[in-house]
């Protein structure tokens, strides 16, 4: 990190447009918020430290906004980088202003998943690194990342930010390289996985109430609550580094399913908001068949690693 800081500082001395912020590690949300506060540019985009961008990343975005001055958010494609292979992900087949249906689909996606033509569509809509945001859209609406949300900050941010405007432009070009790391923070044992999910749930409910969103959003939210238990099981309950015995783990899971919002979501979840695999997961969740749930979690991890897909 020291050498990286020196490189950034040297560039800042050469070009006064570059601002380097030195601060104690307070989490990615605080770092991003400070970056937004310091930003003097008309547009903001984000890059995660493990990833990289195409050489034409900035110039492509700059040229796109010059031709589409009334847009507030630009979306662009990306490349998933795995050991030994890459996968290019496209949102649609051509560039252009996104119509009302696309806007609706993208707005509701952070509450559950992206649906295109009535079917789940595998594309990272909830992240911030494949978008460019108008700075005034963020600052004028007090759009900040939630510091308590040490996981899934992007999703909360987009769940709210995408409600602020319907002026989205899509660029049919892969500009960003998302690097998949098996040992990344998103795959490590995390005793606070459930806490971070619950921070997100609080914010989803806040956003739905703030914008008076329809029942469709609530249904998507209920589906997200119950299916996010998968990540809790993957990162905590059934993770190999969890040293608690089976009975203790199962008792903890019982206590979780008995409390809000899980008990409420399990009663209200609409099957039409679930994929086939999620329906199976929720079925055994309602039955509290934890042995089968562990089998499903372990099997999905194996399958995802074989297919080279990002674990959710």
Features from the language model and the residues they span:
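Short, conserved active-site loop motifs that form the nucleotide-linked donor/cofactor pocket
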Residues: 17-19
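Glycine-rich, basic loop-to-helix element that forms the pyrophosphate-binding segment
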Residues: 23-39
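Donor-binding/catalytic cores of nucleotide-activated saccharide
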Residues: 28, 49-168, 176-192
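Short aromatic/hydrophobic "clamp" motif used to bind/position activated sugar donors
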Residues: 44
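Catalytic core of nucleotide-sugar-dependent glycosyltransferases
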Residues: 173-181, 187-215, 228-262
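Short, conserved SAM-binding/catalytic segment
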Residues: 9-15, 64
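Short, small-residue-biased leader/transition segments that mark boundaries at the very start
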Residues: 1-7
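Membrane-interface aromatic/basic loop that binds lipid-linked glycans or pyrophosphate carriers
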Residues: 238-312
């Amino acid at each position: 990190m020291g050498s990286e800081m020196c490189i950034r500082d040297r560039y800042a001395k050469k070009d006064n447009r570059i601002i380097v912020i030195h601060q104690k590690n307070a989490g990615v949300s605080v770092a991003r918020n400070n970056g937004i506060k310091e930003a003097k540019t008309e547009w903001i985009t984000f890059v995660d430290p493990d990833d990289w961008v195409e050489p034409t990343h900035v110039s492509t975005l700059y040229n796109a906004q010059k031709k589409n001055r009334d847009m507030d958010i630009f979306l662009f494609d990306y490349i998933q980088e795995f050991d030994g292979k890459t996968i290019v992900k496209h949102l649609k087949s051509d560039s252009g202003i996104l119509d009302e249906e696309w806007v609706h689909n993208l707005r509701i996606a952070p509450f559950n998943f992206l649906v295109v033509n009535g079917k789940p569509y595998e594309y990272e809509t909830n992240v911030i690194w494949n978008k460019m945001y108008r700075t005034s859209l963020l600052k004028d609406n007090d759009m900040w990342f939630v510091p308590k949300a040490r996981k899934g900050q992007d999703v909360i941010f987009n769940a709210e930010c995408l409600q602020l405007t319907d002026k989205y432009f899509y660029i049919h070009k892969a500009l960003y390289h998302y690097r998949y790391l098996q040992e990344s923070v998103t795959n490590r044992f995390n005793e606070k996985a459930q806490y971070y999910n619950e921070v997100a749930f609080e914010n989803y409910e806040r956003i739905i109430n703030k914008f008076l969103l329809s029942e469709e959003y609530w249904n998507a939210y209920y589906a997200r609550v119950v299916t996010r238990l998968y990540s809790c099981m993957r990162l905590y309950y059934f993770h190999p580094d969890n040293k608690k015995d089976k009975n203790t783990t199962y008792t903890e899971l019982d206590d979780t399913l008995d409390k809000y919002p899980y008990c409420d979501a399990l009663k209200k979840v609409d099957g039409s908001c679930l994929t086939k695999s999620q329906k199976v997961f929720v079925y055994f969740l309602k039955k509290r068949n934890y042995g089968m749930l562990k089998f499903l979690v372990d099997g999905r991890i194996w399958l995802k690693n074989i297919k080279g897909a990002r674990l959710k």
